[in-house]
C-alpha cells in the first residue's frame, strides 16, 4: 500500500496533500514499472473511519499515517486487449448557432 504521513505537513489545510503527493509518486513509479515490462493498477482506498482503523492495525500504522491507495503489480497478459474508443470527427460534433436576426 501507499501510505501518506500527515505529520510531515504543518497546517490542517494541508491534510489532503498526502493524496496529491502520493498519487504523483505512484504515477512516476508506474512509468518506471512499464520500462521493466510490468503493468500496474491503482486501487482506491476509501476514507471510511472503521476501515481506516482496521487498516491502521493490520499495517501497524501510526496515528498520523493514512493509506492513500494500493497498487497491484504484475506481468501483463500478452494477449490482453487494450480498450479503445473511436473519437468523433470535428464535423460530427461541431455546430454553429444561427445568428441571423440577433441584435
What label would you give each PLM region?
Residues 1-103:
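Acidic, surface-exposed loops and disordered segments
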Amino acid at each position: 500500500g501507499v501510505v501518506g504521513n500527515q505529520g510531515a505537513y504543518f497546517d490542517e489545510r494541508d491534510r489532503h496533500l498526502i493524496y496529491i503527493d502520493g498519487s504523483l509518486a505512484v504515477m512516476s513509479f508506474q512509468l518506471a514499472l512499464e520500462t521493466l515490462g510490468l503493468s500496474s493498477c491503482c486501487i482506491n482506498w476509501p476514507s471510511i473511519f472503521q476501515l481506516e482503523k482496521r487498516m491502521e492495525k493490520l499495517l501497524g500504522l501510526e496515528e498520523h499515517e493514512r493509506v492513500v491507495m494500493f497498487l497491484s503489480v504484475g506481468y501483463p497478459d500478452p494477449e490482453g486487449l487494450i480498450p479503445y474508443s473511436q473519437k468523433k470527427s470535428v464535423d460530427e460534433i461541431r455546430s454553429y448557432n444561427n445568428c441571423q436576426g440577433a441584435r
